[in-house]
Structure formats: C-alpha cells, structure tokens
Amino acid sequence: MSTTSQTLTEAATSKFVRIKEGDLDLQLHYNDCGSGVETVVMLHGSGPGASGWANFNRNVEPLVAAGYRVVLMDCPGWSKSDPIVCSGSRSELNARALKGLLDAIGLDKVHIIGNSMGGHSAVAFALANPSRVGKLILMGGGTGGPSQFVPMPTEGIKLLQGLYREPTIDNLKKMMAVFVFDSSSLTEELYQARLDNMMSRRDHLENFVKSLAINPKQFTDYGPRLGEVTAPALVIWGRDDRFVPMDAGLRLIWGMPNAELHIFNRCGHWAQWEHADKFNRMVLDFLTH
C-alpha cells in the first residue's frame, strides 16, 4: 500500500465547517485530500446513504497523486452534514452551500466533478459564480427537463424515491440493481455500508420525503440557460443509465458552448465507479490539457 493511499482514508480526511451563506446557517462535512495548487471539488448524487466519499472513493487517489487538492462535500441533508428540508431548488441550495464552503476554507476558483444531483448543483454553481469555475466534469446530471425517449419519472428515480419512503435492504438492492450495468459487481459489503449510512441518519431520509411533498420538482431545468455556462465541460454518461437517460447528456452538449461528450458502453448511472480506471485517465487528461 502506498503512503498516499494510507493517508487517503475517509477518517483521516474528514473535516467540518460552519457556513453562513444568505439565510443558510449549516454545519457541513467534507473530506479534504492532498495539497495541490489547483483544487477539484466533487459533488455526490441524491441516493439514500450517499456521501462524497461513498461516491468518489475510487477517484480521489489518482487526482491527489497527479498534484491536485481534492475536496468532497457532503451536501446539506446527506451523510454527516446538517439536515434540511428543501422547499425550493435543491440544485441552487447545494450551489449556495458550496459557495459557503469555498469561502470558509479560502478557495476561490475550482474545478468541479458532479455526479447526478452533483451535476445539477455544479451547473447551478457555474451559473451563479462563473468566475469561480475552472472546468466542469458532469456525469449523469446537469440539467432537469423531460427525456424525449423515456417516460418520466424513470425506473431508477421511482426506485430511489421508494427507498427513501421504505428504507429496507430489499429496496436498496432493487435500486442498486438498476444503478449499475453489471449488478454482479455489487458486494454484500457495499450494500451493508450503504444501508448503515442510510439508517444512521433517519432524519435525512424523512426530510427528503418531506421536501418532495412540498416541491416534487427539486431540480431546476437549466436547459434555457446552458448557453451561459462557458467553462470547458466534459460530459460523461452511461449508455445504459436507467436513472437519467442519455439524451439529457445530449441536451448539455447542445446547450453549453464548450462541452464535449463521452458515452461509456455497458455503464449505468455511476460511471466514475463502474469504469473507474478509464474515468480517472479521462478526467486527468481533460484537466491538464
């Protein structure tokens, strides 16, 4: 085991910060890895039990080894960050939380990697703070709006919402089975870790259900504003994504003037995990050229 991997554990990189951003007054949890001149922020998705570390633990070490500082934010209402009921745009809430975090820890311009909800939130942040974004990497998210090919809500989103309402191991396995292309890659250890994270914060689960009842459309459709996002963007999608259909990725590259698209074959909604090695090489190449 390398010295880098020995120090890059969730516990060793775990930190908390209090943010005050407008009417937000929250304690956020984040993981702070490496010490490079440039910083990459990673934003996780909206699944029950999600966290920055759970989403991106296969992607941190290559970035740190390449000389980047990596910050993984637990969004408000997930993992070790404070609970919240969101009655408005979840994307904008997370963008404001990210601004508060960056201000609190003294970071100005960052690159952002966002998966699913994290992609939506990254676009929201780029629209509100264009001068603070270097490059964007968006996977399985980035804008709302209906699919032209798949009935909405999608199969995956229905299972996700069902898991929030009834957080059982059986419902977790049903959701995870459509989360990735090859469900044989999912281990009992992974299921248990996700279940433990979910059940350790029942308040987060209950608040997500309350948020949906108040505002069923938690994620803003940024389609009409994508032309304002001028940062270089790498859009990555799984051909077999059953949560956010592939044509959402096409919307992003049609709308954002400096975006390019890569589609992974035999890949679901978790490209950074399902194709970690290829994903890591692609991201490093994009960030450095």
UniProtKB/Swiss-Prot annotation:
GO function terms (MF aspect): 2-hydroxy-6-oxonona-2,4,7-trienedioate hydrolase activity; 2-hydroxy-6-oxonona-2,4-dienedioate hydrolase activity; protein homodimerization activity
E.C. designation(s): 3.7.1.14
Signal peptide location: none
Subunit structure: Homodimer.
Purpose: Catalyzes the cleavage of the C5-C6 bond of 2-hydroxy-6-oxononadienedioate and 2-hydroxy-6-oxononatrienedioate, a dienol ring fission product of the bacterial meta-cleavage pathway for degradation of phenylpropionic acid.
The protein's name: 2-hydroxy-6-oxononadienedioate/2-hydroxy-6-oxononatrienedioate hydrolase 1
PANTHER family linked: ALPHA_BETA-HYDROLASES SUPERFAMILY PROTEIN, HYDROLASE
Family to which the UniProt record says this protein belongs: Belongs to the AB hydrolase superfamily. MhpC family.
Involved pathway(s): Aromatic compound metabolism; 3-phenylpropanoate degradation
Class of the enzyme per the UniProt entry, highest EC level: hydrolase
Keyword RNA-binding: no
InterPro entries with a match to the protein in the record: AB_hydrolase_1, AB_hydrolase_fold, Epox_hydrolase-like, MhpC_alpha/beta_hydrolase
GO BP: any one term: 3-phenylpropionate catabolic process
Catalysed conversion reaction: (2Z,4E)-2-hydroxy-6-oxonona-2,4-dienedioate + H2O = (2Z)-2-hydroxypenta-2,4-dienoate + succinate + H(+); (2Z,4E,7E)-2-hydroxy-6-oxonona-2,4,7-trienedioate + H2O = (2Z)-2-hydroxypenta-2,4-dienoate + fumarate + H(+)
Domain called AB hydrolase-1: residue spans: 39-275
Listed HAMAP family: MhpC
Residues with site note (Transition state stabilizer): S116
Keywords: Aromatic hydrocarbons catabolism, Hydrolase
Residues forming the catalytic site: H269 (proton acceptor)
Marked site: Catalytic role in ketonization of the dienol substrate (substrate destabilization): R194
GO CC annotations on file: cytoplasm
